[in-house]
């Protein structure tokens, strides 16, 4: 595993995408990012004290792209378990790509594919302070515990946990992984709104299905939301 460290960079994920000699588990770490982003191209505002990192994952030829659509969920439970190894707090997984603590976002995940690699980008609020409107919707590990952490220790713990969960995934243990995810399903039983092109549907979130879709119960029917096809909001 090669490690690339930066005090500042545009994006750790973009750095890895630009590399010509990509290798499995190449890891890029930055203190700050100037052009970090989340799903749908949303800007990801970075601060010093965050864990900002991305790594490469070589595509396994015998795993279908449909199976790999579950990778954000596998990454999510890996981050959650990694954080729980550091502090035994009640972390939750919010479908499809966030970790929550005390009803606030503490981590965002972005999984992208380039050629025969996945680029997995992760941003975790660790030692950074949060003020203003951001403090109403996000939190950091230090805010919950009052402690300071060695950021790279957090990164390597999360990466170690990812390798364990990914090995389980490759060994056919997806149903067991999914059960763990659903036990930490932040949206379950919450009223949410699915938002598409010129339409909205309100419903109650249920479990995450075996294919990675989120169950939604509306007044008329039970439906399933696909990863990446819609976005959602909730009260």
What is the meaning of each model-derived region?
Residues 1-85, 146-150:
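N-terminal lobe of the biotin/lipoate ligase/transferase fold
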Residues 7, 93-95:
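Short loop/edge segments at beta-strand edges and connector loops
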Residues 24, 63-91, 101-235:
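Long, positively charged amphipathic alpha-helical accessory segments at protein N-termini or as interdomain linkers
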Residues 46-47, 94, 208-209:
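A short, compositionally biased micro-patch
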């Amino acid at each position: 595993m090669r490690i690339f460290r930066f005090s500042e960079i545009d994006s750790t994920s973009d750095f890895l995408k630009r590399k010509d000699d990509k290798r499995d588990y190449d890891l890029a770490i930055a203190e700050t990012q100037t052009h970090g982003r989340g799903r749908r191209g949303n800007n990801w505002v970075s601060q010093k004290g965050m864990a900002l990192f991305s790594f490469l994952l070589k595509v396994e030829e015998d795993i279908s792209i449909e199976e790999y659509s579950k990778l954000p969920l596998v990454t999510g439970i890996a981050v959650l378990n990694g954080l729980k190894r550091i502090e035994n707090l009640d972390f939750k997984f919010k479908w499809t790509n966030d970790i929550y603590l005390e009803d606030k976002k503490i981590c965002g995940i972005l999984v992208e594919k380039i050629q025969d690699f996945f680029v997995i980008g992760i941003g975790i609020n660790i030692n950074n302070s949060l003020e203003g409107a951001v403090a109403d919707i996000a939190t950091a590990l230090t805010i919950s515990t009052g402690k300071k952490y060695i950021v790279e220790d957090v990164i390597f713990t999360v990466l170690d946990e990812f390798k364990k969960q990914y090995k389980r995934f490759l060994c056919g243990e997806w149903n067991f992984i999914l059960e763990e995810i659903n036990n930490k399903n932040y949206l379950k039983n919450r009223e949410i709104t699915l938002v598409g092109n010129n339409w909205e549907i309100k419903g109650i979130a249920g479990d995450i299905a075996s294919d990675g879709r989120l169950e939604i119960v509306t007044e008329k029917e039970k439906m399933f939301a696909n990863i990446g096809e819609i976005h959602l909001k909730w009260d």
